[in-house]
C-alpha cells in the first residue's frame, strides 16, 4: 500500500514535466530534389507551436538551415539525416538568434561542424551568453557546396533586427524564416524584439526581389499553399 501511495505521489510530481514535453521533429517529403523541410516543436506561452526549418543535401554533406527548437533533438536529427541520406551534417546556417533558429551552436562547434551566422546575430548571441558561430555569413554572396547553391540575404528588420532569408535559385524556393508568417497565422506572434514599423517595408522588398519564387516557406505553422507573404502584410496592417 505504501509503495502504491509513493508511486502515486511521484507520478503527480512528475506530471508537469511530462506535459511540458514536446513532439519529436518531423522530416517532410522533399519539396525539390535535395531540398527538405523539417518541423520541430516548442512551447511558448503555454501553447505548442511548430517551427519550419530546412536542410539541403549536397554531394559533400548536408547543410542545415536553423536547428531544432529543443537541444535534446540535435543529435537525433543528425543521426536520422545520416541514416536517410548516408551523409553527415557539414554546416549549420542560423537565420536569427532565437532558440528555434540558432539555438545552441556550441553543440555543432564542439563537433567540428562549421556554423554560420551574421555579425548581428552573433552580437545578440554573445549578449545572451550563448555560443557564437565559427563563421560569419556574407549576405548576398552565393554559397556553393557540393553542387548546390544558395544565397543568404538580409532585406531589413522585421521579426527581429537580424532576420535573414535564404534563396535557393536552382529551385526558386525562398526560406523566409520568421520574417514571413504562415497563411494560417492569426497574429504576428512574439514581437518584443520586432520592428513593426520597418517590417512591411522589408516584406515589400522581399516581394520585389524574389518575385520568381514559386514557394516561400514561413517560419512557423502551415507552410503549404501560397499567400504567406500577403497574409504577413495583412497582419502587419492590423497592428
UniProtKB/Swiss-Prot annotation:
GO biological process: antibiotic catabolic process; response to antibiotic
Residues where Zn(2+) 2 binds: 100, 178, 220
CDD domains: IND_MBL-B1
Cofactor descriptive note: Binds 2 Zn(2+) ions per subunit.
The reaction(s) this protein catalyses: a beta-lactam + H2O = a substituted beta-amino acid
Residues that bind a beta-lactam: 181
Pfam families documented for this protein: Lactamase_B
Top-rank lineage group of the source organism: Bacteria
Cellular component GO terms, alphabetical: periplasmic space
Keywords: Antibiotic resistance, Hydrolase, Metal-binding, Periplasm, Signal, Zinc
One Gene Ontology MF term: zinc ion binding
Cofactor(s) listed in the protein's UniProt record: Zn(2+)
EC number in record: 3.5.2.6
Main location: periplasm
Top EC category: hydrolase
Residues annotated to bind Zn(2+) 1: 96, 98, 159
Other facts noted in the record for this chain: The class B beta-lactamase family has a specific amino-acid numbering system known as BBL, for standard numbering of class B beta-lactamases. A multiple sequence alignment was used to derive a consensus sequence and then the consensus was numbered taking into account insertions and deletions. This allows use of identical numbers, e.g. for active site residues, despite differences in protein length. UniProt always uses natural numbering of residues, hence there appear to be differences in numbering between this entry and some papers.
PANTHER family given in the database record: ACYL-COENZYME A THIOESTERASE MBLAC2 (PTHR42951:SF4), METALLO-BETA-LACTAMASE DOMAIN-CONTAINING (PTHR42951)
Quaternary structure, from the entry: Monomer.
Functional summary from the UniProt entry: Class B beta-lactamase which confers resistance to the beta-lactam antibiotics, including penicillins, cephalosporins and carbapenems. Acts via hydrolysis of the beta-lactam ring. Has penicillin-, cephalosporin- and carbapenem-hydrolyzing activities.
Protein name: Metallo-beta-lactamase IND-1
Organism the protein comes from: Chryseobacterium indologenes (Flavobacterium indologenes)
Name of the gene this protein is made from: IND-1
